[in-house]
């Protein structure tokens, strides 16, 4: 029999995970905006790229580790470390983070260069950065520079199904890693405490075929557990 207390605890843990993802994005936003402004001041691309990569890695690891404060078990730190340093779909978190941060720097350099072509003042460039750092290549200033100054650049593409927006790639990578870390720690905590399996419950009425496919049956330990995607708010009741 599933109790109200079990449901309450499962929902609270999911909310803590979602809050960790939300808080991480706020911090990542500040890091990226600061980095873009540094590029406009002439700080080297390589230095900025390495700095933001390190900062975002620290932010992501910090929020992932917060999961252990809610679900403590003997091998928690070891399990989390292995996950954070592990290869998932061909790359580690840090591999992807480094790649996406380099893309962000390259995108911002294009936007800043367009501003220079238009002879924008430093204050105007700063304003453009504030308004466009989340999707710099769609900044109106680029189209203006192309039209008025014959400005050219090679628009990057990364393949079907992959975002071309570096900001989105960075934040998705960070938030998905945090979400997966919370899910792993939660699952392993109950496994260590003798759980035989779990039921999945929807935490939202939003239509989602992936989430819905896991509802209504008992899952044995070792089967997929929530979160099932980056914005998943499903929760599991372990028995």
Predicted regions span which residues?
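N-terminal leader/targeting and assembly helices and adjacent pre-domain segments
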Residues: 1-162
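Acidic, glycine-rich two-metal-ion catalytic cores of nucleic acid-processing enzymes
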Residues: 154-239
């Amino acid at each position: 029999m599933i109790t109200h207390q079990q449901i309450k605890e499962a929902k609270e843990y999911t909310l803590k995970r979602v809050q960790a993802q939300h808080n991480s994005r706020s911090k990542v936003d500040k890091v990226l905006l600061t980095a873009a402004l540094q590029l406009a001041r002439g700080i080297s691309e390589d230095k900025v790229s390495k700095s933001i990569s390190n900062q975002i890695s620290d932010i992501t690891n910090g929020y992932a580790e917060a999961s252990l404060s809610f679900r403590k078990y003997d091998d928690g730190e070891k399990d989390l470390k292995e996950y954070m340093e592990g290869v998932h779909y061909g790359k580690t978190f840090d591999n992807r983070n480094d790649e996406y941060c380099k893309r962000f720097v390259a995108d911002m350099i294009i936007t800043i260069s367009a501003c220079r072509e238009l002879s924008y003042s430093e204050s105007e460039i700063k304003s453009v950065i504030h308004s466009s750092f989340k999707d710099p290549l769609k900044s109106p200033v680029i189209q203006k520079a192309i039209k008025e100054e014959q400005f050219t650049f090679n628009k990057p593409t990364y393949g079907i199904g992959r975002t071309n927006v570096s900001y989105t790639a960075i934040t998705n990578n960070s938030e998905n890693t945090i979400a997966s870390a919370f899910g792993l720690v939660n699952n392993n905590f109950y496994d260590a405490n003798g759980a035989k399996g779990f039921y999945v419950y929807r935490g939202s009425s939003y239509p989602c075929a992936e989430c819905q496919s896991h509802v209504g049956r008992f899952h044995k330990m070792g089967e997929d557990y929530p979160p099932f995607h980056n914005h998943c708010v499903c929760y599991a009741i372990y028995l």
